[in-house]
Amino acid sequence: MVMKATVDDDASGWELGVPEKMEKSSTSWVDITQDFEDACRELKLGELLHDKLFGLFEAMSAIEMMDPKMDAGMIGNQVNRKVLNFEQAIKDGTIKIKDLSLPELIGIMDTCFCCLITWLEGHSLAQTVFTCLYIHNPDFIEDPAMKAFALGILKICDIAREKVNKAAVFEEEDFQSMTYGFKMANSVTDLRVTGMLKDVEDDLQRRVKSTRSRQGEERDPEVELEHQQCLAAFSRVKFTRVLLTVLIAFTKKETSAVAEAQKLMVQAADLLSAIHTSLHHGIQAQNGTTKGDHPIMMGFEPLVNQRLLPPTFPRYAKIIKREEMVNYFSRLIDRIKTVCEVVNLPNLHCILDFFCEFSEQSPCVLSRSLLQTTFLVDNKKVFGTHLMQDMVKDALRSFVSPPVLSPKCCLYNNHQAKDCIDSFVTHCVRPFCSLVQIHGHNRARQRDKLGHILEEFATLQDEAEKVDAALHTMLLKQEPQRQHLACLGTWVLYHNLRIMIQYLLSGFELELYSMHEYYYIYWYLSEFLYAWLMSTLSRADGSQMAEERIMEEQQKGRSSKKTKKKKKVRPLSREITMSQAYQNMCAGMFKTMVAFDMDGKVRKPKFELDSEQVRYEHRFAPFNSVMTPPPVHYLQFKEMSDLNKYSPPPQSPELYVAASKHFQQAKMILENIPNPDREVSRILKVAKPNFVVMKLLAGGHKKESKVPPEFDFSVHKYFPVVKLV
């Protein structure tokens, strides 16, 4: 039945059906059912009537509001039980605020830990931590252990939220910082809360000792159970205190606080095995009393905050299991230990590499934020002690040894030269701080932000070249044997190329490319970006050697003693070697894909609304803002990669042979690297089987088969193992 009211309905009757409303309300109602059906018959099948006043916004609002499938606030009306808040539950006697048994304490603590982790993984506080009624107002709790624990959890949430907000490396899918008006225990100091937890911890430790078995004494099963339960509660309270103390340590500006956090993390890790083995001692959740599998047990009400959620599609918060909780904490501790290592790094290049490697593990938002705030402390100094400008100068010295930064050079104390280099270094600070911050974002967002930061680095590149030219002119007047050509420019170009390479490679990790696109991505990397990178690294190495020779000559002039020449390890040699290996891997993959295409093993889409050129230009669009290296446009790419320019043009067997040589070359380069790391061994695990597969294909193996090959990216994120099906 479709009804129309002549007066606005009374808001109090929104939950009633139409017949009840008609009886209850004094409103004049008109039955329009027949008129509505007649109007519908005038419409043809599939035709819709669209009123000008009923746009997309109104349509979405009409669908969402008060529809249980769309409005999160309506879920509470669908359960048969009464949803009580903390005060109502206390009056009703459904929740204990004093004399909680050990199993109850253990169970509540474990579920709280699970809720805390679920919040850190991107759900709202209202659907996770604040489903625990004890957290709503710890002042009502009389049990000392429960009160201290509730305050501890609130403080952990508050400091974690502050850290994540300050680091600003989260997006809406990573983290939700809204507190929904709940008090975050701001009236109690951090020191007071850690003191309360320590008192409870000491009390439980005394109970653990008093129930311990003595030699030669027959063990009472009840006393043994009490001992195990006391130990379980003690481990959880101590873990809460240690975790809170670690987060407090990270709020301090001194570097010594990081060392303190490192020691505490070792303690926290030691407690996890005791927590894991005692999970069964806590009271368990009773499932089936609400929708989904949110734990229902004393002290928890999953629907208590449902009305606080905005009228949006209900986001289901699946609380993680207790066994997973222990594993998560174990990984979090390892990540925080890794974060602590950043303060020992000597220069900016090492720090950037560290951030890249840390980000590759896809760490949680809390550990990413802690790394950011440890690197750049509130006073905007690196680790709270070093100026970013000094870090940039050190990075320049270690990479290209520019004469202007050498104390033995005439430009070192030249005011004009000093102003030039200081101005350039100051302009470097913002882009490099942004680059470090980008590595704190999740992997998908990183790629997008890397594309945008190229514009800033392009501007920096332009400035570097101008400063180089000015310094070179000054230097020639005083020291004609020295050059200042392309020193700063080489350094900025190196970072530009790294960003471009990372941007393209991350597309493989995020599974953005279709198989038919692989060939031009690998071509751009091997023929262009890695070629430029190796040339840039070689130029930087040459600048270093030239500066070292001048320094040695100056030393000889002062000292008459003959010094034995030691063979120096070139600082950039390892990176040059790795770039050669990467270039060979990319070249091997490019030739493999071209050969597969020749053999009809690559399925191409039937382009209707786009074309290969449109896709190509979309993939490399961010590079258009960069002047050096100049972007390769689609027609240039087709011309440069055209095999018909060779006489005779190579066929697929020859391309398979060429690809196998590239994989073999990469394998030989990597096998000669001293002290290989995990990255080297991962690439070797791809290069070796691909070399064998290319040899088989070159010999005509499965030549007639048109079944596309499989590309297995499980060993390495950027280079797949080619598998023939």
Curated annotation (Swiss-Prot):
Biased composition annotated in UniProt, kind: Basic residues: 558-571
Broad class of where this protein is predominantly found: cytoplasm
Gene Ontology, cellular component aspect: cytoplasm; cytosol; NatC complex; nucleoplasm; plasma membrane
Subcellular localization: Cytoplasm
Pfam family, one: Mak10
Residue list for modification Phosphoserine: S187
Record GO biological process: negative regulation of apoptotic process; smooth muscle cell proliferation
Region (Disordered): 548-573
Keywords: Cytoplasm, Phosphoprotein
UniProt entry tagged with the keyword Magnesium: no
InterPro entries on file: Naa35/Mak10 (IPR007244)
Binding partners and assembly: Component of the N-terminal acetyltransferase C (NatC) complex, which is composed of NAA35, NAA38 and NAA30.
PANTHER family in UniProt: GLUCOSE REPRESSIBLE PROTEIN MAK10, N-ALPHA-ACETYLTRANSFERASE 35, NATC AUXILIARY SUBUNIT
Family to which this protein belongs: Belongs to the MAK10 family.
Function: Auxillary component of the N-terminal acetyltransferase C (NatC) complex which catalyzes acetylation of N-terminal methionine residues. N-terminal acetylation protects proteins from ubiquitination and degradation by the N-end rule pathway. Involved in regulation of apoptosis and proliferation of smooth muscle cells.
UniProt protein name: N-alpha-acetyltransferase 35, NatC auxiliary subunit
Naturally occurring in which organism (per UniProt): Mus musculus (Mouse)
